[in-house]
UniProtKB/Swiss-Prot annotation:
This is Superoxide dismutase [Mn], mitochondrial. Homotetramer. Binds 1 Mn(2+) ion per subunit. Its EC number is 1.15.1.1. It comes from Candida albicans (Yeast). GO terms for cellular component: mitochondrial matrix. It is found in: Mitochondrion matrix. The keyword Manganese applies.
Length: 234
């Protein structure tokens, strides 16, 4: 009944071909690259309390996410230089850094956007008349069931990783729940991330310590389903 795909089949890293194409463009004389930066937040750090503390949000945003931004920019600059010098071994090593930090950058951008304070609609379920709301009921029977399945996937992550609720355009716009290790992100063009959930310790440990099940349970109070509805239209 449920359309839940195995993470081993759908967790996708950026391809070598894509990375090479990016570096080719970056190395061209006519290409001007703007550096990546942190996204602007739609709420104050403390606005997601008591479910996610302001302290966690501040450190998560200004330290962890900023580090991915810094490392991504630095890795790209180094890769452009290495390509211009024909340093193939260095390019191969930097490709891994670009994939990791690029994934960390993208995943966290999704994370901040799919959060909303309760005062701004956080936790309010999708509209029953929306395409997303209708698809959830059709596939899972209720939003609670989708959340239950997603929490089960989150609990199964060994070490650090992410869970994504995605729209599968290749399968009739069904909803899938997938997980990724570390900072791997969703790159399949047929999969549209609707909700991204950070299962790294830095996302919860200061508040929930080793009881991450409580974090998984409580974060749904500040999930921005309106944003998920918007993404489902893509």
């Amino acid at each position: 009944m449920f359309s839940i795909r195995s993470s081993s089949r759908v967790l996708l890293k950026a391809s070598s071909a894509t990375t090479r194409a990016t570096l080719n463009a970056a190395a061209s004389k006519t290409f001007t690259r703007s550096k990546y930066s942190l996204p602007e937040l739609d709420y104050e750090f403390s606005a997601t309390e008591p479910y996610i503390s302001g302290q966690i949000n501040e450190i998560h945003y200004t330290k962890h996410h900023q580090t991915y931004v810094n490392n991504l920019n630095a890795s790209i600059e180094q890769a452009v230089e290495a390509k211009s010098k024909g340093e193939v071994k260095k390019l191969v090593a930097l490709e891994k850094a670009i994939n990791f930090n690029g994934g960390g950058y993208l995943n966290h951008c999704l994370w901040w956007k799919n959060l909303a304070p309760v005062s701004q609609g956080g936790g309010q379920p999708p509209s029953e008349d929306s395409k997303l709301g209708k698809q959830i009921v059709k596939q899972f029977g209720s939003l609670d069931k989708l959340i239950e399945i997603t929490n089960g996937k989150l609990a199964g992550i060994q070490g650090s990783g992410w869970a994504f609720i995605v729209k599968n355009k290749a399968n009739g716009d069904t909803i899938d729940v997938i997980t990724t290790a570390n900072q791997d992100t969703v790159t399949d063009p047929n999969l549209v991330p609707l909700i991204a959930i950070d299962a790294w310790e830095h996302a919860y440990y200061l508040q929930y310590q080793n009881v991450k099940a409580d974090y998984f349970k409580n974060l749904w109070h500040v999930i921005n389903w309106k944003e998920a509805e918007r993404r489902f239209e893509f």
